[in-house]
């Protein structure tokens, strides 16, 4: 391989690594909602990164990179769950990620409680509410999930109602 091709490959690799560093927490959050054991969480994270790497040369920047990352991460996680027959339909989020660190912080406890409730939702509902909590617009959620904007709005309303009902039942 000539030096120009090597430079191009190194440039692509550096760009990819920069993207992964920027979106690492987002990828972990998506993976976190779909698995419990830390070893599996790390394996799933690696699968997502591998799928992102495989798809990176084909990324044409026709959409925001965050949408592209969410789409691949969600699809990888859902595929993983389908393959793993021994993984339960929902997982418990009682261990702490690096994004939930303060044990005595009331806000952190509320977040833990919210994520435990979210974990009881179906796969699509989990994906939708996760994107909503990441401040994605209905249009962005629609593009990532493949649902219509109207369907996203309806589903979000129902998801919020389910979460409110779960909260009251606790």
Report each predicted region and the residues it spans.
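Structural recognition of an alpha-helix C-terminal capping motif at a helix-to-coil junction
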Residues: 29, 43-50, 54, 63-75
């Amino acid at each position: 391989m000539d030096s120009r091709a090597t430079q191009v490959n190194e440039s692509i690799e550096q760009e990819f690594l920069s993207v992964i560093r920027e979106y690492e927490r987002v990828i972990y959050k998506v993976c976190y909602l779909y698995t419990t054991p830390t070893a599996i969480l790390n394996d799933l994270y690696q699968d997502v990164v591998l799928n992102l790497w495989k798809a990176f040369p084909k990324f044409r920047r026709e959409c925001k990179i965050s949408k592209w990352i969410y789409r691949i991460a969600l699809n990888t996680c859902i595929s993983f769950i389908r393959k793993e027959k021994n993984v339960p339909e929902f997982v418990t989020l009682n261990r702490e990620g690096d994004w939930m660190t303060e044990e005595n912080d009331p806000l952190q406890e509320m977040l833990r409680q919210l994520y435990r409730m979210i974990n009881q939702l179906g796969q699509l509902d989990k994906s939708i509410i996760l994107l909503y909590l990441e401040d994605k617009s209905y249009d962005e959620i629609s593009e990532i999930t493949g649902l219509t904007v109207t369907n996203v709005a309806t589903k979000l309303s129902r998801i919020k109602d389910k979460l409110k009902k779960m909260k009251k039942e606790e």
